C-alpha cells in the first residue's frame, strides 16, 4: 500500500492520509485513528476543519465530496485535466489544475469563477481558512508573448500563459471574486506559499529555498525576512501557529526550521512606509521536486529592493493585473492602486531560525511514497502545547517539543508509524 498524499486539517486537530487502498483520518492530540476506508485509489484528500466533509480525488480528473459520518457521496465533479490540489474553507472550494483554478461555493457547489493561470505543475496555491478574510493566493500569471505563427484551424487552442520567471503572488478575494493585489515576493519562481488562519499573513519561498519572507495581507507590506540556509533546498511545507507568532518550515535538508515573528517588526516598520503587523496557517504536500541553481539575492541576502526591475509607478503593476486576471476592470485597478506599496529598501539582515528539528534518518526499507528522492515532510504546530508535528513521506508521524524561551534543537517526544 503506497501513501499518495498527507495533510492536516485547517486547525491541525486531524491528519488525513490518502493511499492506494483507501484513506485514513487520525486525531493529532492524542494521536489515534478516527476513520478508515480500504476501498479505492485516493490521490488527494482534504478535510473541512473537524467536520465529516471530505474532498477526495479518486481518478486524476474526478473529485468526490463525501460525508464520512453518513458514508454517503454528496457530489462528484469531473475536470478537463488532472486535479493537482484541492483547498477548502467554510465558504469556498478551490480546485487547482495545471493552468486553471476553479472556485466553488461550498454550500451549493455552484461554480463561481474560473481563473486562467500560468503553467503550475506543482499546484502552488493557498486558501485562507478564514471565512472573513477569504483570500486565495497563487503565482501571478504571465501572458505569452504575441506570436506571428498562426496554428491551423483544427489545432487545439494553446495556453495563453507562460511559466513564471519571477516570484510574484496574486492575492484574490474569493468572496468578491476580484484580484486585489500583487506581492513581489522573490526574484526566482515560487516553490511554496501559505496563509495564516486569519488570512492576514502570507509566507513565501522561492525555488532556491534560502530566504523565507512574510507579508501582510491584503496590503502586501513585507514584515519579516528569514534565512533558512545558504545552500539551495526545496521547501516542502510552511505553517504558521495559531497565534501567528511562529512560522515552521520543512525542506529537503530534513531539518525543520522555526522562525519567530516578533523580532523584526520594529526594523520592518522603520524601513517600510506604512507597515502593519496583523496577526495564524495552511498546509501542503508536494509530490514533485525542482532543480536548483544559486540565486544571488536569496543566497547572499542582498537588499530586497534590487530583486525586481524598477517600476516608475503603481500603474505598471495595475496593468499587469489587468492583463493577467480575468474580468478585472478599471474599478478594480483603482482599488489595487491603494493597496500596492511603493518600492522600499530593506537594510536589515535576514534573521536565522530560533529553533530547529533534525528528522530521524529513514530506514533503508521504508516504503513511503515509493520515491527514492529526499524525505518529504508536512509540518504543523500544536494548538495546546509548544510542540511541532511532522508527517513524513516514509509514513512516520513525529511530535517534537520546543523550548519557546530558549529555542535551540527540539526534542523528539512521540513517534508513530
UniProtKB/Swiss-Prot annotation:
Pfam families: PROPPIN. A motif (L/FRRG motif) lies at residues 226-230. The keyword Iron-sulfur does not apply. It comes from the Eukaryota. Residues 262-278 have a biased composition (Low complexity). Transmembrane segments: none annotated. GO terms for cellular component: endosome membrane; phagophore assembly site membrane; vacuolar membrane. It is found in: Preautophagosomal structure membrane; Vacuole membrane; Endosome membrane. The keyword Magnesium does not apply. Residues 261-314 are annotated as: Disordered. Keywords: Autophagy, Endosome, Membrane, Protein transport, Repeat, Transport, Vacuole, WD repeat. GO terms for biological process: autophagy; protein transport. Its main location: membrane. InterPro entries: PROPPIN, WD40/YVTN_repeat-like_dom_sf, WD40_repeat_dom_sf, WD40_rpt. WD repeats lie at residues 1-36, 69-114, 139-182, 185-225, 230-269, 312-358, 370-410. The N-terminus might form a beta-propeller domain involved in specific binding to phosphatidylinositol 3,5-bisphosphate (PIP2), leading to the association of the protein to the membrane. The L/FRRG motif is essential for the cytoplasm to vacuole transport (Cvt) pathway, for the recruitment of atg8 and atg16 to the PAS in nutrient-rich medium, and for its recruitment to and dissociation from the PAS under starvation conditions. Component of the PI(3,5)P2 regulatory complex. The PI(3,5)P2 regulatory complex regulates both the synthesis and turnover of phosphatidylinositol 3,5-bisphosphate (PtdIns(3,5)P2). Necessary for proper vacuole morphology. Plays an important role in osmotically-induced vacuole fragmentation. Required for cytoplasm to vacuole transport (Cvt) vesicle formation, pexophagy and starvation-induced autophagy. Involved in correct atg9 trafficking to the pre-autophagosomal structure. Might also be involved in premeiotic DNA replication. PANTHER family: WD-REPEAT PROTEIN INTERACTING WITH PHOSPHOINOSIDES WIPI -RELATED. Belongs to the WD repeat PROPPIN family. This is Autophagy-related protein 18. It comes from Aspergillus clavatus (strain ATCC 1007 / CBS 513.65 / DSM 816 / NCTC 3887 / NRRL 1 / QM 1276 / 107).
Amino acid at each position: 500500500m503506497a501513501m499518495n498524499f498527507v495533510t492536516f486539517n485547517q486547525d491541525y486537530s486531524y491528519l488525513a492520509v490518502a493511499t492506494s487502498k483507501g484513506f485514513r483520518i487520525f486525531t493529532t492530540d492524542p494521536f489515534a485513528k478516527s476513520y478508515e476506508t480500504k476501498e479505492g485509489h485516493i490521490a488527494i484528500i482534504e478535510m473541512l476543519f473537524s467536520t465529516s466533509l471530505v474532498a477526495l480525488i479518486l481518478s486524476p480528473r474526478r473529485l468526490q465530496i463525501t460525508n464520512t459520518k453518513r458514508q454517503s457521496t454528496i457530489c462528484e465533479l469531473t475536470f478537463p485535466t488532472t486535479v493537482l490540489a484541492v483547498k477548502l474553507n467554510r465558504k469556498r472550494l478551490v480546485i487547482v489544475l495545471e493552468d486553471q483554478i476553479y472556485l466553488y461555493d461550498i454550500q451549493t457547489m455552484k461554480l463561481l469563477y474560473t481563473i486562467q493561470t500560468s503553467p503550475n505543475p506543482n499546484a502552488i496555491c493557498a486558501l485562507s481558512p478564514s471565512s472573513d478574510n477569504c483570500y486565495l493566493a497563487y503565482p501571478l500569471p504571465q501572458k505569452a508573448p504575441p506570436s506571428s505563427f498562426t496554428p491551423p484551424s483544427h489545432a487545439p487552442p494553446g495556453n495563453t500563459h507562460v511559466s513564471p520567471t519571477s516570484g510574484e503572488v496574486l492575492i484574490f478575494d474569493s468572496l468578491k471574486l476580484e484580484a486585489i493585489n500583487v506581492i513581489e515576493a522573490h526574484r526566482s519562481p515560487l516553490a511554496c506559499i501559505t496563509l495564516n488562519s486569519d488570512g492576514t499573513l502570507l509566507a513565501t519561498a522561492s525555488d532556491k529555498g534560502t530566504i523565507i519572507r512574510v507579508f501582510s495581507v491584503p496590503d502586501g507590506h513585507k514584515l519579516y525576512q528569514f534565512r533558512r540556509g545558504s545552500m539551495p533546498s526545496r521547501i516542502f511545507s510552511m505553517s504558521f501557529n495559531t497565534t501567528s507568532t511562529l512560522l515552521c518550515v520543512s525542506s529537503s535538508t530534513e531539518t525543520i526550521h522555526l522562525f519567530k515573528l516578533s523580532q523584526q517588526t520594529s526594523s520592518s516598520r522603520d524601513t517600510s512606509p506604512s507597515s502593519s503587523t496583523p496577526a495564524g496557517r495552511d498546509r501542503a504536500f508536494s509530490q514533485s521536486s525542482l532543480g536548483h541553481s544559486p540565486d544571488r539575492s536569496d543566497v547572499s541576502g542582498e537588499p530586497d529592493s534590487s530583486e525586481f526591475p524598477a517600476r516608475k509607478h503603481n500603474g505598471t503593476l495595475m496593468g499587469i493585473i489587468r492583463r493577467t486576471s480575468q474580468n478585472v476592470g478599471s474599478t478594480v485597478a483603482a482599488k489595487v492602486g491603494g493597496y500596492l506599496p511603493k518600492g522600499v529598501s530593506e537594510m536589515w539582515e535576514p534573521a536565522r531560525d530560533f529553533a530547529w528539528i533534525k528528522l530521524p534518518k529513514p530506514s533503508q526499507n521504508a516504503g513511503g511514497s515509493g520515491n527514492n528522492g529526499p524525505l518529504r515532510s508536512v509540518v504543523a504546530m500544536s494548538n495546546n502545547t509548544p510542540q511541532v508535528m511532522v508527517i513524513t513521506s516514509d509514513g512516520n508521524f513525529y511530535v517534537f517539543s520546543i523550548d519557546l524561551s530558549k529555542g535551540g534543537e527540539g526534542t523528539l517526544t512521540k513517534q508513530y508509524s
